[in-house]
Amino acid sequence: MAKEIAKSLLDIEAVTLSPNDLYTWSSGIKSPIYCDNRVTLGYPLVRGAIRDGLINLIKEHFPEVEVISGTATAGIPHAAFIAEKLKLPMNYVRSSNKSHGKQNQIEGAKSEGKKVVVIEDLISTGGSSVTAVEALKLAGAEVLGVVAIFTYGLKKADDTFSNIQLPFYTLSDYNELIEVAENEGKISSEDIQTLVEWRDNLA
């Protein structure tokens, strides 16, 4: 499954690699990889495979889940697809409270006293996941864990989740993606060294 998802992400250019002409993330980090999983929404077969893959992760690791929660904004559609298939309540978590109305940070199903799984599109450092988890816990939820489409495999993410003692699982990761990209002839062996060094240095 990991390789199939990685191939799909590369094929539809949800993930692009540029070892010699780095991208600049919103955080200012210079990176040879850019991931925009919102692109998957335009490909029904890909988004369906992602939905089913995430559902399998949830059934395997968090079978007692009662509420599906998406992170705003890119996690929301995938959470909706999953909640619909599993016939479960769903909500989503903003990065901060609204500045108007009821000033809610969580919209949708009530979380208090419920076992919740958080849906992310991408895990880089784990920061957005922690924000969502903390908001849900504050609302009285029992957060079981996080599932996501892809992770860069950064040590910082591992440390982030370890610090809050929460498990996370992803459909694919950086190592799988690089391997698939090489097999597909999208990158050279020299590119792989650059990509691995970038990840290790950033970690």
Curated annotation (Swiss-Prot):
Q: Which Gene Ontology molecular-function terms are recorded?
A: magnesium ion binding; orotate phosphoribosyltransferase activity
- Coiled-coil stretches, from where to where? none
Tell me which residues bind 5-phospho-alpha-D-ribose 1-diphosphate. R94, K98, H100, E120, D121, L122, I123, S124, T125, G126, G127, S128
Q: Which cofactor does it need?
A: Mg(2+)
Enzyme Commission code? 2.4.2.10
Going by the UniProt record, its keywords in alphabetical order are: Glycosyltransferase, Magnesium, Pyrimidine biosynthesis, Transferase
**Gene Ontology BP terms:** 'de novo' UMP biosynthetic process; pyrimidine nucleobase biosynthetic process
Annotated residues for binding of orotate: S124
Pathway field: Pyrimidine metabolism; UMP biosynthesis via de novo pathway; UMP from orotate: step 1/2
Any Pfam family the entry gives: Pribosyltran
Reactions catalysed, as given in the entry: orotidine 5'-phosphate + diphosphate = orotate + 5-phospho-alpha-D-ribose 1-diphosphate
Q: Does the keyword Secreted apply?
A: no
Family annotation (PROSITE patterns): PUR_PYR_PR_TRANSFER (PS00103)
Q: Tell me, how does this one assemble?
A: Homodimer.
The UniProt function text for this chain reads:
Catalyzes the transfer of a ribosyl phosphate group from 5-phosphoribose 1-diphosphate to orotate, leading to the formation of orotidine monophosphate (OMP).
Write out the similarity annotation: Belongs to the purine/pyrimidine phosphoribosyltransferase family. PyrE subfamily.
Name of the molecule in the record: Orotate phosphoribosyltransferase
